[in-house]
Amino acid sequence: MESPQIRVAMLCGNGRSSRILYNSLATLPGVHITRVIVENSPSALALLRGRVRKLGTARVAGQLLFMAYNRLLSRASAQRIQQLMKGYGISDAPFPTANLHQVDSINNPGTIGLLAAARPDAVIVNGTRIIAASILSAIACPVINTHMGITPRYRGVHGGYWALARGDRENCGVTVHLVDPGIDTGGVLYQDTIHPDSRDNFNTYPIHQLAKAIPLIMAALDDVRRQQIQVRPGVLPSMLWSHPTLFEYLGNRIRHGAK
């Protein structure tokens, strides 16, 4: 007997990773994406002010220097990214307009109504700000996130990079986990590792991670379909990571080859 189709809604940003996930899930048999809710990018100034409050001016200045450098690195990585995407058979084509809704913030009260109308069996999250507890509590089905790192050791951003930067290659990977109000603190469903080579860098690690994540998401959706979700232990200790500063990046590249 054929498995029943699972209804999926997505809460995501409009970045490459979200588009890759959409295009990969949309082609899977037994998956019906009923709605895609895309969050507009937050104000750069608001993000900057928030970082300064949390991290201090000096660290944020170092991060901005790295981000400027990474623009150049990103351009130099374009060919490798396309090569990897072709090899993995994944696409970052734009979202189709059918069932696409844009919101200023995923935490707008209107998000609840959009999700309720979509009647999902599961909600897949990618590339959004932290989802408010008021939104999560109003969602009646499992909410599942793809995190670019092994949790809870590499919560926050650029988890794969930070594992390599610390010489922790066996924990350079990706996690599919349930979403709670914390920062990547939800229960782990599935994890897997990646093995980048000398051609890879800060901008190509996520392509490897996304390719590994897709079968993990499918496994999680199968668990939802069967009502057999099982939380697994993650990798400790729990640590929260942010963007590297330029000097951290250069030091990590020299010490551990993390590019």
List PLM regions with ranges:
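One-carbon transfer enzymes
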Residues: 1-259
